[in-house]
From Swiss-Prot:
InterPro entries: Hyethyz_kinase, Ribokinase-like. ATP binds at residues 122, 166. The gene is thiM. It catalyses: 5-(2-hydroxyethyl)-4-methylthiazole + ATP = 4-methyl-5-(2-phosphooxyethyl)-thiazole + ADP + H(+). Substrate binds at residues 46, 193. It is an enzyme of class 2 (transferase). Its EC number is 2.7.1.50. Catalyzes the phosphorylation of the hydroxyl group of 4-methyl-5-beta-hydroxyethylthiazole (THZ). Pathway: Cofactor biosynthesis; thiamine diphosphate biosynthesis; 4-methyl-5-(2-phosphoethyl)-thiazole from 5-(2-hydroxyethyl)-4-methylthiazole: step 1/1. Belongs to the Thz kinase family. One of its GO terms (molecular function) is hydroxyethylthiazole kinase activity. This is Hydroxyethylthiazole kinase. Its cofactor is Mg(2+). One of its GO terms (biological process) is thiamine diphosphate biosynthetic process.
Length: 266
């Protein structure tokens, strides 16, 4: 199994180091994102004030920019933080929430991509298709279409990033390497912000692993294995979310070896 040796080591490193992950997180999911970051072993900070984001982003081990809550103040803070992270070699994960739903959101995403050095872009099928120039795939912030590996490769090549497309299957590519993650459960679609939360876990692995394809796969598999284990304990979304956080906290390297469904595409 790909990463079966590396994942246990990286999970231990993550929990030993407790890296700082600076979040720009939307109001809807902020508490849950902080909790999953803590559960996997990293240290979250949710800070958005222009007066401090440059300092915090410079000191962080990873920066996660989630555009779910947008106004001009937040956008300027995101740009300030992104530039500071770029200057200090801090990896940036961008979640283009709702890209394609409005012109404003799409323009903000492209501005962040042009003015900062984003390492990973993670979104659902509709959002990522919008970045690839295909419209009509987003309703609100939800995807109404599926994207494919070809979309991930196109985005990776166009923007110089690792692209992560989440869905029933997850597609990860840096334009050269291509990986499909097949873990997960349909229950995740009934938990608001599950995609935002998986971004927190990916960013946590990015903080200790600068191979961003591997870090993205590690984060996806960790979150989705925890979701599968949570589903075994609850079939309803409220308690499922509670168990999801517990299972992230209890996750082991052996869980990856036993449960990961990862396909490297040749």
């Amino acid at each position: 199994m790909w990463l079966s040796d590396e994942f246990p080591r990286d999970l231990k490193t993550l929990r030993d180091r407790k890296p700082l992950v600076h979040h720009f997180m939307n109001f809807v999911v902020m508490n849950d994102a902080a909790n999953v970051t803590l559960a996997i072993g990293a240290s979250p900070i949710m800070a958005h004030a222009k007066e401090e984001v440059e300092e915090l982003a410079s000191k962080a081990n990873a920066l996660y920019i989630n555009i779910g809550t947008l106004d001009e103040y937040w956008v300027e803070s995101m740009i300030i933080a992104g530039k500071a992270a770029s200057r200090n070699n801090v990896p940036i994960l961008l979640d283009p929430v709702g890209a394609g739903a409005t012109r404003y959101r799409t323009e903000v995403v492209k501005r962040i991509l042009s003015e900062t050095e984003v390492s990973v872009v993670k979104g659902n099928g509709g959002e990522m298709l919008a970045l690839a120039g295909v419209t009509g795939g987003v309703k609100g912030v939800d995807s109404i279409v599926n994207a494919t590996m070809d979309t991930a490769v196109k985005i990776a090549e166009e923007y110089g990033v690792t692209a992560v497309i989440t869905g029933p299957w997850d597609y990860v590519s840096d334009g050269v390497r291509k990986v499909i993650v097949k873990n997960g459960t349909p229950l995740l679609q009934y938990v608001t912000g599950s995609g935002c939360m998986v971004g927190s876990v990916i960013a946590s692995f990015m903080a200790i692993n600068r191979d961003f394809v591997k870090a993205s796969v590690e984060g996806l598999v960790a979150f989705e294995i925890a979701a599968e284990k949570a589903e075994a304990k609850s079939k309803a979304p409220g308690t499922f979310k509670q168990y999801l956080i517990d299972e992230l906290f209890n996750l082991t390297g052996d869980d990856y070896v036993k449960m990961a469904k990862v396909e490297v595409v040749q």
